[in-house]
């Protein structure tokens, strides 16, 4: 998988982190920089870690699935992307999550796991595509950290409803990457991304 594809996947995966960061920023009057860095760093670490876990889980079954690899990668990315779009359009009331402090402890752990579950399946897709997992995990972690940080910084300036469309955009990116993988393997197209 190309570096550009990995970057787009990283951006797609980071959409949930961005939306949650905006939500947290919108519900806290003022957040100290160290808290922002702690939350953004945790999001980045969990995204990278889940990709690695998914990758190595995928390697254990690679011989069995090599004949269907492109369909599996497409299906996983399509499922994740469509689920992200669906969840974004559902308009779940994130205000209910604020009852628990999402900037530390169990609240932070819970939201970090929730925003990184998709990365687990992407790690499996990376194993199928024989992607350089070290570079992919590093990029996904750094992009998630950066996007989360930006979400916090922009949270007070952006309407809370905007986070819904960020989730839709992230889902569409993952669906597009899935379609790209399918086209490359079934039609022999060499798509730049």
Curated annotation (Swiss-Prot):
It holds the Pfam family Mntp. Keywords: Cell membrane, Ion transport, Manganese, Membrane, Transmembrane, Transmembrane helix, Transport. GO terms for molecular function: manganese ion transmembrane transporter activity. HAMAP family: MntP_pump (MF_01521). Probably functions as a manganese efflux pump. Its main location: membrane. The chain crosses the membrane at residues 6-26, 48-68, 71-91, 108-128, 132-152, 165-185. It is a multi-pass membrane protein. The keyword Transmembrane applies. PANTHER family: MANGANESE EFFLUX PUMP MNTP-RELATED. One of its GO terms (cellular component) is plasma membrane. It comes from Dehalococcoides mccartyi (strain ATCC BAA-2100 / JCM 16839 / KCTC 5957 / BAV1). Belongs to the MntP (TC 9.B.29) family. It is found in: Cell membrane. This is Putative manganese efflux pump MntP.
């Amino acid at each position: 998988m190309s570096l550009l594809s990995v970057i787009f996947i990283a951006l797609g995966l980071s959409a949930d982190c961005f939306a949650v960061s905006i939500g947290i920023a919108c519900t806290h009057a003022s957040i100290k920089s160290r808290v922002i860095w702690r939350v953004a760093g945790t999001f980045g670490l969990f995204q990278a870690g889940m990709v690695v876990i998914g990758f190595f889980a995928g390697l254990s079954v690679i011989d069995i699935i090599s004949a269907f690899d492109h369909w599996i990668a497409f299906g996983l990315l399509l499922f994740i992307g469509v689920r992200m779009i669906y969840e974004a359009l559902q308009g779940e009331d994130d205000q209910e999550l604020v009852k628990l402090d999402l900037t530390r402890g169990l609240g932070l752990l819970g939201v970090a796991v929730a925003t990184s579950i998709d990365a687990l399946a992407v790690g499996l897709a990376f194993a199928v595509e024989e992607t350089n997992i070290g570079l992919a995990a590093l990029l996904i972690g750094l992009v998630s950290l950066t996007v989360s940080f930006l979400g916090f910084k922009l949270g007070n300036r952006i309407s809370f409803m905007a986070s819904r469309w960020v989730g839709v955009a992230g889902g569409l990116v993952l669906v597009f990457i899935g379609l790209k993988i399918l086209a490359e393997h079934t039609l022999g197209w060499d798509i730049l991304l």
